[in-house]
């Protein structure tokens, strides 16, 4: 056709590095520690809840309420209302979406207008930038910077900090929203109360909405505490809090997410939702509702999944850290999430000339080399940065440690072979 087919809002966002690395991994005998999903079953109670939804009330095969299956919106309002210290109305303050991804897209489409600026904290979950651009907005980036590490010690995600003056300087009269991700993907940083108070004060000062992606909120380790910024004084009325049943119950294929927020903002998300997705799968929502009802009864008790799961994943994290160190990698200990990043600076010094395009960031060339030669899949951390900042953070790669014991043992075998070759 002579006419340009694609909308201009798609310019510059058509390349997806995930496709390249997934394809490369499929061509080799590898242990895939790249993509963020568990390779073990969801908890029994969640599977049983889905079975109840499929085999029970036949009306669960039909549409439910556009903005969420009523038992699900009710339990989300009750559960998170207590956590956030808010009276949450299931009809006005809760929207069920097609996963956390759908929640993010709906939020950007509802709030971001042509020329609006959106502050994104780096490293960032890679969809934030294209979603901002598709809505007509301009992403504005501010980076977490790693602090010094004592000789012989491992770094921690808690040492990566925002510069308060730099962050404040990113706000302008065009700033519409700030995107916060805690625990952070890929870094695993859990923002402290002091850090959240800084963000909150700037959002209030400049009348900016905070879109907070908290899909990993139950995966917090070493006694750290997840704090929702919406629970801070003056923030509920300007915050959209996004969650994911896939991450919460280790069932990423269910694709149920949600947004919590004040009605004066949520009404605009409902407009986008009803004119795009319209409705989310009823049976998945019913299973999530039953699972949350169970967890509410057991909340903070030793038998709660929200207590047991992070304990198990901390053991997986520690296993991976020990194993990666055996070949000279230097993990940054994450406070939360599915992921850890590891410093490959020593390899960059020893093997500076890995194959690849001249302008290709080193971490991408290293991951390709590792897939082909060592049989391990990771994700280059530079893809979680804006293009101008990628060259400053091309000496880190990301691993997912939320994996079955058999997968971690297979990783160990690959690393043993690697160690012999050193």
From Swiss-Prot:
<dbReference type="GO" id="GO:0005737">
    <property type="term" value="C:cytoplasm"/>
</dbReference>
<feature type="binding site">
    <location>
        <position position="398"/>
    </location>
    <ligand>
        <name>substrate</name>
    </ligand>
</feature>
<dbReference type="Pfam" id="PF00155">
    <property type="entry name" value="Aminotran_1_2"/>
</dbReference>
<comment type="pathway">
    <text>Amino-acid degradation; L-kynurenine degradation; kynurenate from L-kynurenine: step 1/2.</text>
</comment>
<feature type="binding site">
    <location>
        <position position="36"/>
    </location>
    <ligand>
        <name>substrate</name>
    </ligand>
</feature>
<keyword id="KW-0663">Pyridoxal phosphate</keyword>
<dbReference type="GO" id="GO:0047804">
    <property type="term" value="F:cysteine-S-conjugate beta-lyase activity"/>
</dbReference>
<dbReference type="InterPro" id="IPR015422">
    <property type="entry name" value="PyrdxlP-dep_Trfase_small"/>
</dbReference>
<keyword id="KW-0808">Transferase</keyword>
<feature type="binding site">
    <location>
        <position position="185"/>
    </location>
    <ligand>
        <name>substrate</name>
    </ligand>
</feature>
<dbReference type="GO" id="GO:0070189">
    <property type="term" value="P:kynurenine metabolic process"/>
</dbReference>
<dbReference type="InterPro" id="IPR051326">
    <property type="entry name" value="Kynurenine-oxoglutarate_AT"/>
</dbReference>
<comment type="subunit">
    <text>Homodimer.</text>
</comment>
<dbReference type="GO" id="GO:0097053">
    <property type="term" value="P:L-kynurenine catabolic process"/>
</dbReference>
<dbReference type="GO" id="GO:0030170">
    <property type="term" value="F:pyridoxal phosphate binding"/>
</dbReference>
<feature type="modified residue" description="N6-(pyridoxal phosphate)lysine">
    <location>
        <position position="247"/>
    </location>
</feature>
<dbReference type="GO" id="GO:0016212">
    <property type="term" value="F:kynurenine-oxoglutarate transaminase activity"/>
</dbReference>
<dbReference type="InterPro" id="IPR004839">
    <property type="entry name" value="Aminotransferase_I/II_large"/>
</dbReference>
<keyword id="KW-0456">Lyase</keyword>
<keyword id="KW-0032">Aminotransferase</keyword>
<protein>
    <recommendedName>
        <fullName>Kynurenine--oxoglutarate transaminase 1</fullName>
        <ecNumber>2.6.1.7</ecNumber>
        <ecNumber>4.4.1.13</ecNumber>
        <ecNumber>2.6.1.64</ecNumber>
    </recommendedName>
</protein>
<dbReference type="GO" id="GO:0042803">
    <property type="term" value="F:protein homodimerization activity"/>
</dbReference>
<dbReference type="GO" id="GO:0005829">
    <property type="term" value="C:cytosol"/>
</dbReference>
<keyword id="KW-0963">Cytoplasm</keyword>
<dbReference type="InterPro" id="IPR015424">
    <property type="entry name" value="PyrdxlP-dep_Trfase"/>
</dbReference>
<comment type="similarity">
    <text>Belongs to the class-I pyridoxal-phosphate-dependent aminotransferase family.</text>
</comment>
<dbReference type="GO" id="GO:0009617">
    <property type="term" value="P:response to bacterium"/>
</dbReference>
<dbReference type="GO" id="GO:0047316">
    <property type="term" value="F:glutamine-phenylpyruvate transaminase activity"/>
</dbReference>
<dbReference type="GO" id="GO:0005739">
    <property type="term" value="C:mitochondrion"/>
</dbReference>
<dbReference type="GO" id="GO:0009058">
    <property type="term" value="P:biosynthetic process"/>
</dbReference>
<dbReference type="InterPro" id="IPR015421">
    <property type="entry name" value="PyrdxlP-dep_Trfase_major"/>
</dbReference>
<comment type="function">
    <text>Catalyzes the irreversible transamination of the L-tryptophan metabolite L-kynurenine to form kynurenic acid (KA), an intermediate in the tryptophan catabolic pathway which is also a broad spectrum antagonist of the three ionotropic excitatory amino acid receptors among others. Also metabolizes the cysteine conjugates of certain halogenated alkenes and alkanes to form reactive metabolites. Catalyzes the beta-elimination of S-conjugates and Se-conjugates of L-(seleno)cysteine, resulting in the cleavage of the C-S or C-Se bond.</text>
</comment>
């Amino acid at each position: 056709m002579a006419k340009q087919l694609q909308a201009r809002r798609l310019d510059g966002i058509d390349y997806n590095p995930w496709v390249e690395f997934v394809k490369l991994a499929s061509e080799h005998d590898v242990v895939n520690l790249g993509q963020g999903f568990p390779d073990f079953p969801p908890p029994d109670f969640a599977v049983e809840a889905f079975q109840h939804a499929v085999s029970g009330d036949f009306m669960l095969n039909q549409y439910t309420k556009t903005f969420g299956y009523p038992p699900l919106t009710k339990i989300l309002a009750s559960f998170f209302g207590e956590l956030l210290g808010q009276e949450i109305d299931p009809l006005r303050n809760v929207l069920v979406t097609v996963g956390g991804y759908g929640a993010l897209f709906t939020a950007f489409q509802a709030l971001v207008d042509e020329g609006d600026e959106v502050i994104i904290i780096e490293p960032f979950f890679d969809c934030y930038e294209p979603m901002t651009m598709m809505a007509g907005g301009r992403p504005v980036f501010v980076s977490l910077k790693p602090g010094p590490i004592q000789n012989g010690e491992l770094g921690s995600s808690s040492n990566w900090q925002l510069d308060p003056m730099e962050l404040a300087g990113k706000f302008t009269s065009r700033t519409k929203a700030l995107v916060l991700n805690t625990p952070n993907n890929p870094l695993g940083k859990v923002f402290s109360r002091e850090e959240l108070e800084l963000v909150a004060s700037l959002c209030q000062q400049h009348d900016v909405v905070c879109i907070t992606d908290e899909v990993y909120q139950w995966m917090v380790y070493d006694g750290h505490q997840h704090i929702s910024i919406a629970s801070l004084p003056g923030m509920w009325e300007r915050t959209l809090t996004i969650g994911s049943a896939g991450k919460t119950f280790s069932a990423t294929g269910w694709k149920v997410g949600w947004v919590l927020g004040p009605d004066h903002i949520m009404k605009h998300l409902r407009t986008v939702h009803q004119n795009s997705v319209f409705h989310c799968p009823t049976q998945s929502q019913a299973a999530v509702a039953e699972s949350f009802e169970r967890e509410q009864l057991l909340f903070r008790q030793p038998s709660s999944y929200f207590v047991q799961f992070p304990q198990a994943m901390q053991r997986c994290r520690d296993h991976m850290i020990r194993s990666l160190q055996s070949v000279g990698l230097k993990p940054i200990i994450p406070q939360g999430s599915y992921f850890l990043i590891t410093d490959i600076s020593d390899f960059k010094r020893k093997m500076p000339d890995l194959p690849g395009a001249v302008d290709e960031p080193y971490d991408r060339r290293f991951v390709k080399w590792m897939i082909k030669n060592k049989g391990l899949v990771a994700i280059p951390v530079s893809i979680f940065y804006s293009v101008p900042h990628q060259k400053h953070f091309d000496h880190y790669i990301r691993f997912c440690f939320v994996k079955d014991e058999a997968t971690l043992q297979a990783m160990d075998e690959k690393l043993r072979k690697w160690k012999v070759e050193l």
